[in-house]
């Protein structure tokens, strides 16, 4: 059983906001080439900081990437964005990672692509509620499932608590909290 080195791989980040940029920062250290698809192209100074290449067309980006990382919010535009047609564009030796929302990927198509080895593997921090699909995903040797545990660290939870306190204080002071939900 042989693995593959990560140095020199191409990473396509879907959603280059705060989390996407944090991933780009870490990936760059490993010599990974950073590419991204986003609602809007980032300012040139941010692109230069990550040596990132913008792709307006999602399909054109996906078909050239070794790794695709989904980090965008779930909206009407992103729901189902990673369709069977997009998955079919991926290379057979490529991997897809979803740490965003399960509804962004057509999970039935993803299961088929993984079973047929049209995609090398998947890392899913989120997945749908359909029991049959979860069972199929769990039984795939080329898939890793962790139930939305990306922030399940002591430091992460302390940081979340501190943000809550800052947001409450900001609201009480009559200002708009940074992480407002409604």
List each model region and its residues.
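Rossmann-like dinucleotide-binding domain for NAD(H)/NADP(H)
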Residues: 84, 93-182
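Rossmann-like dinucleotide/phosphate-binding beta-alpha-beta segment
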Residues: 1-92
């Amino acid at each position: 059983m042989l693995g593959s080195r990560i140095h020199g791989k191409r990473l396509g980040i879907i959603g280059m906001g705060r989390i996407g940029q944090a991933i780009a920062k870490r990936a760059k250290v490993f010599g990974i080439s950073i590419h991204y698809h986003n609602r809007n192209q980032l300012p040139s100074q941010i692109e230069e900081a990550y040596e990132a290449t913008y792709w307006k067309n999602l399909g054109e980006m996906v078909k050239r990437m070794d790794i695709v990382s989904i980090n965008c919010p779930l909206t009407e535009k992103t729901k189902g964005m990673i369709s069977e047609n997009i998955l079919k564009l991926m290379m057979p030796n490529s991997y897809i990672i979803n740490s965003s929302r399960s509804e962004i990927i057509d999970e039935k198509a993803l299961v088929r692509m993984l079973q047929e080895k049209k995609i090398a593997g998947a890392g899913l921090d989120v997945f749908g509620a359909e029991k049959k699909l979860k069972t199929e995903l769990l039984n795939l040797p080329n898939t890793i499932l962790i139930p939305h545990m990306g922030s399940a660290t002591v430091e992460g939870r302390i940081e979340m608590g501190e943000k809550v306190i800052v947001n409450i204080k900001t609201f009480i002071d009559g200002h708009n909290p940074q992480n407002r939900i409604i």
